Amino acid sequence: MLTDSLFSYATTRHAARSPVPHSTEIAPPESPPRPGHVPPRPERRAWVVLVMIVVFMMISYADKAVLGLAAVPLMEELGIGKSTYGLISSSFYLLFSLSGLVVGFFSARISSRVLLLAMAALWAVAQLPVLLVAAVPSLIAGRVLLGMAEGPAASMSMHALYKWFPTGRRGLPSALQIGGAALGTAVSAPLLTWLIVDHGWRSAFVALTLVSAAWCLVWPFVGQDGPFGEERKPVRGASRPPRAAGPPLRALLTNGTVTGGILSAFGSHWALALSSAWLPVYLQTQMDMTATGASSVVSGVSVVSLALLLSVPAYVDRLKRRGVSSRRADGIPQGLAVLVAGGALALLPFAAGGPVQLLLIAVAFGCHAVALPLHYVTTATVVPDGRRGAVFGVVAASGTLPGLFVPYLTGRLVDGAATETAGYTAAFVLSAGVMAVCGLLAIATIHPERDARRLNPAGASVPAPRQAGVSKPVAQ
């Protein structure tokens, strides 16, 4: 999903928070930048907040990764099979989507600063049950609580981040926020594996508890809501400016751009759920790697994701500032990333030779990450600021649904097959098919400029990009 804020933003006061309007009158979405228009540069404070949010996401994904890294010794100590382990892993997502949805609808009433602090505090508490009693029920209880607390993390931290960065400057910050996930896995995998191998798997859970608590101590001093996308209190005696009539929430959620973004996120999170729960186990049991070797591969995959997250969205921002449409810059790449990752995953079970397998693993579990920041960017293009938190909550809740069943389904397929190898083959081919369908549908349905004009015909105009040497807007 590097984060927080020590900034001295001299000219910006703390933005007033307002509840979701009871009427249908809401501020229109921010228009995509006009060709040749350069959005205002974010103030220095925004970058401090960004750093804290990246760290927030690093901790979040380390919490997710620790169970997979500890899976082999944990299954051996507790004497559980792969189906039971898959159930424990899936339990993380039992309340994950629901909590993301609920918190999203309250995000306009509660400061992002408070929401993020509450989440991180619960992360620390959620690691305690397994430390007190190492058993399947305590593992499930801790993972359910952790999933509930982490469900809103990506969408709400992105919502908080967008309060600091204007339209046209959000691609790189979005990528860094999501990059915190890849960076968290890349950094935490070798460190947590070292703790697991040398000090037992419980030590990794203790370390994550302490890190979450430390973040909670720093955030209240530096966390703050930003100036963009929040309603300001009018000056006393001044008339409130007219506001555009906004579309109903149902129309926002069912337009092609938001639906396509959900599909690309669904395919990406399918791969993410599969890799978080099963990639370390697959590397150790099917490719005969040590725990340390497996953690190195997991870190390498995260580095691939991070490199793409840092390069692709930044390039996308530059394209849009040059007049390239959001569909071409944001929409097609996110669907294509999921499609390519699915293709690599389909080939993985049939590849011969370690280097080829490692390359396919890097593509299958690394490339899909590009879809995660870009689907938020395309969604924000068509959604009014006053409803962005709620829509982000729905998008996150829908897109992350694979985590609820993919780990358990994979465990059942592996346990139920004639051999473990056959089980993994079935799981990977099935996953590849789902990812391919999601990627293709995302490419076909995401049209940000078109949908923004349809949803806000009376609002601010959404200019179409112009091709070089052409004076007329290009039809979307």
What are these model-predicted stretches?
Residues 142-181:
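Cytoplasmic helix-loop-helix junction between adjacent transmembrane helices
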